[in-house]
């Protein structure tokens, strides 16, 4: 008798400005979950926050030219019950079917990027509901989403980070003293965002206020960081079902030669639309530097109390590696660096997502 398949809810879309990236990531996950092992229940969240039963066709979640996918409200409306005695039940909301159990899932893969998904909110819901899920828990997800608290936790562990200033709501701009501690160029970012959305490279102080206003269209709290001269690299961290935590090879992102100052960082279009960046997987680094980065990535994973997975971004400077950010639900598109780094060490995409699901099931929910 064959073993029953594990029912996996893949949740994507969401209310954040990374909605479309989440959809593309989910399409790749759907494409690579082994149908002999898993029964997939796709759940889309619209930009307004409605939950609907999605399509199992991954092509519906692909980038077409420069057109990005999104979740519409055409599917059957549903909700996940927060009652742990009915763990995993998906309840219909549409008239005529309200209250009907559409499915009961064993584990959730929340392929959500940004606010209302990657920031601890859905992780809290899943903990309340008693449903195992892929990725870090509430604390790590919330801390990893907020660049202010990410760096505070990393600094507390003695990990190398760059200098930043936090502009809270109501603080219009930098003081003269803060400007003197930063050095141009600076990067102005939404404090709780990803996919390089809302980021501006500022080469002269006259452009600062416009950059702050641009970032505040995405988040009332803004980060201003000193630019760091160095090579931009990334490292993946993966937890296995037995609790072993490993780091991947290092990947380097290189902007094309001749890019002007306004294009010389890895922004949203460079990541998903323009195909202008060049990548080295693995990065061409001295073995000692690669080993140091991999060790720092695992330490950062531990500092935030992550589980499951993370991607840690670095600059390699003349004085050594500096941690830039940690991403607790990295992109899972076909071109995303996280799956590419693991593929380079023999963990292909299908094995990667299976490992993540198996780790989530082994971990369970609750205090741990």
UniProtKB/Swiss-Prot annotation:
Pfam families: Dala_Dala_lig_C, Dala_Dala_lig_N. The gene is ddl. Belongs to the D-alanine--D-alanine ligase family. Cell wall formation. GO terms for biological process: cell wall organization; peptidoglycan biosynthetic process; regulation of cell shape. Pathway: Cell wall biogenesis; peptidoglycan biosynthesis. ATP binds at residues 179-234. NCBIfam families: D_ala_D_alaTIGR, PRK01966.1-4. Its EC number is 6.3.2.4. One of its GO terms (cellular component) is cytosol. This is D-alanine--D-alanine ligase. Keywords: ATP-binding, Cell shape, Cell wall biogenesis/degradation, Cytoplasm, Ligase, Magnesium, Manganese, Metal-binding, Nucleotide-binding, Peptidoglycan synthesis. Binds 2 magnesium or manganese ions per subunit. InterPro entries: ATP-grasp, ATP_grasp_subdomain_1, D-Ala_lig_Van_CS, D_ala_D_ala, Dala_Dala_lig_C, Dala_Dala_lig_N, PreATP-grasp_dom_sf. GO terms for molecular function: ATP binding; D-alanine-D-alanine ligase activity; metal ion binding. It is found in: Cytoplasm. Its main location: cytoplasm. It is an enzyme of class 6 (ligase). Residues 151-358 form the ATP-grasp domain.
């Amino acid at each position: 008798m064959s073993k029953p398949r594990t029912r996996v809810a893949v949740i994507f879309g969401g209310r954040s400005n990374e909605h479309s990236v989440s959809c593309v990531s989910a399409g790749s996950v759907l494409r690579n979950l082994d149908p002999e092992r898993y029964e997939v229940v796709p759940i889309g969240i619209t930009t307004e926050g409605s939950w609907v039963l999605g399509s199992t066709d991954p092509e519906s979640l692909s980038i077409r030219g420069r057109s990005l996918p999104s979740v519409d409200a055409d599917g059957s409306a549903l909700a996940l019950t927060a009652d742990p005695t009915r763990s995993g039940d998906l309840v219909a909301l549409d008239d005529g079917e309200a209250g009907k159990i559409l499915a009961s899932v064993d584990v959730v893969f929340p392929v959500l990027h940004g606010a209302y998904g990657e920031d601890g909110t859905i992780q809290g819901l899943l903990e309340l509901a008693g449903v195992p899920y892929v990725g870090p828990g509430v604390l790590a997800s919330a801390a990893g989403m907020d660049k202010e608290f990410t760096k505070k936790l990393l600094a507390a562990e003695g990990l190398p980070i760059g200098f930043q200033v936090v502009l809270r709501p109501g603080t219009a701009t930098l003081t003269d003293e803060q400007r003197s501690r930063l050095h141009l160029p600076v990067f102005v970012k939404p404090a709780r965002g990803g996919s390089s959305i809302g980021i501006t490279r500022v080469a002269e102080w006259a452009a600062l206020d416009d950059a702050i206003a641009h970032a505040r269209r995405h988040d009332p709290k803004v980060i201003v960081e000193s630019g760091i001269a160095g090579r931009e690299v990334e490292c993946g961290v993966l937890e296995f079902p037995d609790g072993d935590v490993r780091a991947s090879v290092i990947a380097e992102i290189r902007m094309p030669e001749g890019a002007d100052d306004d294009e010389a960082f890895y922004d949203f279009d460079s990541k998903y639309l323009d195909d202008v960046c060049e990548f080295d997987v693995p990065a061409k680094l001295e073995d000692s530097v690669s080993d140091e980065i991999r060790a720092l990535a695992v330490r950062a994973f531990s500092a935030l109390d992550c589980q499951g997975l993370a991607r840690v971004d670095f600059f390699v400077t003349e004085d050594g590696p500096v941690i830039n950010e940690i991403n607790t639900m990295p992109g899972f598109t076909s071109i995303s660096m996280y799956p590419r780094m693991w593929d380079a060490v023999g963990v292909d995409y299908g094995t990667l997502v299976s490992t993540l699901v198996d780790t989530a099931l082994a971990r369970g929910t609750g205090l741990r």
